[in-house]
């Protein structure tokens, strides 16, 4: 199982990691240690299916509050 995080792109173009639903709290954090999600890609995609629709994961989001899924490896390597 890969490590996945739920993240959104804010208006400044920075990633904001969200553990609101998976962590059981309502906080958001830019600290990746607080936002790690141990979920399979399939389960994470199903969870956010209504919000994501059929859109591909992209940084070109119009709404900064729309979440997307990135892997921890991508975040750490800054390849997104």
Give the ranges of each region predicted by the language model.
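Short aromatic-glycine-(Arg/Gly/Cys) micro-motifs in beta-strand/loop hairpins
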Residues: 1-31
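Short, mixed-charge low-complexity intrinsically disordered segments
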Residues: 36-80
């Amino acid at each position: 199982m890969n490590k996945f995080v739920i993240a959104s792109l804010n208006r400044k173009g920075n990633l904001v990691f969200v553990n609101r639903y998976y962590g059981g709290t309502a906080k958001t954090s830019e600290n990746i240690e607080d936002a790690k999600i141990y979920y399979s890609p399939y389960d994470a995609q199903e969870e956010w299916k209504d919000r994501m629709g059929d859109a591909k994961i992209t940084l070109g989001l119009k709404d900064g509050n729309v979440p997307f899924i990135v892997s921890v490896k991508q975040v750490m390597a800054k390849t997104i």
